Amino acid sequence: MKKLSVIMLALLMSIGAMAGEKDEYFTLNSGFLFNNTLNATFGYERELNYGNAVELFGEVGNQWQRDPVCGKVCNESFWKGYYWDGGLLYKHSLKKFKNGNFRLRIGPQFGAHTGDYFFAVEGGFEYNYVFRSGIQFSLIQKNQVSFLHGDSFRNGLLIGLKIPF
């Protein structure tokens, strides 16, 4: 019996367990990007070991400009700068807090901007605060460099929620 309890204790000590490991979330973020861009992002996130995570996401946005005819942003000109894309992000944990974490986000994106296809690379930072219910509040600083079309650089802030399931 003593031998069995020593083996069980050694087995329990060798198995690593972390809070939040393998959790899954539905993410929803929105915000403004430079230059005159409104952005909304939705996705699926899976937590990995040591606070790292992977996110598969899609986003839609609109870059508005002044209409040369009416001299301001009009209904006719507002929706002409739309884009959509999707991608995969790896989120490396830089710092863990009691109820939150700070991560580096990096990954590729593919999509279309007013009919022209593009490839992009996204990088940035993310801070998450975890509420008692498991829902997370996110503050995201985003930098996106796009290739193969004129709108080559976007950066800005997004806020959002992560809902566990």
PLM feature segments, named:
Residues 19-66, 162-164:
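Short glycine/proline- and aromatic-enriched beta-strand/turn motifs that initiate or cap beta-hairpins
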Residues 28-32, 56-62, 88, 104-112, ...:
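Transmembrane beta-barrel strands of outer-membrane/channel proteins
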Residues 86, 153-165:
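Outer-membrane beta-barrel "beta-signal"
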Residues 28-41, 80-82, 110-121, 145-154:
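Solvent-exposed loop/turn segments connecting transmembrane beta-strands
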Residues 8, 23, 54-82, 110-114, ...:
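Flexible, solvent-exposed loop segments that connect beta-strands
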Residues 19-23, 50-51, 94-102, 115, ...:
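Short loop/turn motifs that connect adjacent beta-strands in outer-membrane beta-barrel proteins
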Residues 1-23, 165:
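Cleavable N-terminal export/targeting peptides
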Residues 46, 90-94, 110, 127-129, ...:
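Residue-level signature of outer-membrane beta-barrel architecture
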